[in-house]
A protein has these predicted regions:
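Conserved acyl-donor/pantetheine-binding loop and adjacent beta-alpha core of acyl/acetyltransferases
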Residues: 9-37, 45
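Conserved acetyl-CoA-binding loop-helix of GNAT-fold acetyltransferases
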Residues: 40, 46-59, 82-86
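Active-site beta-strand termini and strand-to-loop segments that position acidic
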Residues: 1-2, 107-112
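Short beta-strand micro-motifs in enzyme catalytic cores
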Residues: 31-33, 101-108
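Conserved GNAT acetyl-CoA-binding A-motif
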Residues: 54, 61-73
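Conserved beta-hairpin
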Residues: 1-9
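Residue-level recognition of the GNAT/N-acetyltransferase active site
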Residues: 36, 41, 72-74
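Conserved catalytic-core motifs of GNAT/GCN5-like acyltransferases
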Residues: 72-73, 85-104
Length: 118
């Protein structure tokens, strides 16, 4: 917005090795996009920009035929947990990064590529 980065996230194909050691069960076992380091400037929070960002990732999945999107977040990150839940993400378990990062909730959502056609 006005040449200022207001939303940032890294979108990586199959890019989280810790997800192989999930305490829980993923919905899918195939390719996925992971969203990491996701942030919105405080002055732009609650304006729907995070929702738009995640929707764009879902569109990428449709074009590239990637079955799902995975995200992890801190247990106390209520805004992100609520956003993911409202967008159809399911809590699949916990991922442990160790050290200061510790454990986090792990979410997954089937992408548009996996939704049945009408």
């Amino acid at each position: 917005v006005n040449e200022e980065v207001v939303v940032y996230g890294a979108v990586i194909l199959n890019g989280e090795p810790k997800y192989k050691k999930l305490v829980g069960n993923w919905i899918t076992d195939g390719d996925y996009y992971v969203i990491h380091r996701f942030a919105t400037l405080p002055s732009f929070q609650r304006e729907g920009l995070a929702r738009i960002f995640i929707s764009k990732v879902n569109s990428m999945c449709e074009v590239e035929k990637i079955p799902s999107i995975k995200v992890d977040t801190n247990f106390d990150n209520t805004p992100m947990i609520n956003l993911l839940s409202s967008m159809g993400f399911c809590i699949c378990g916990r991922v442990n990064y160790g050290g200061n990062r510790g454990q986090r909730f792990a979410f997954e959502k089937l992408s548009i590529a996996m939704e049945p056609a009408d």
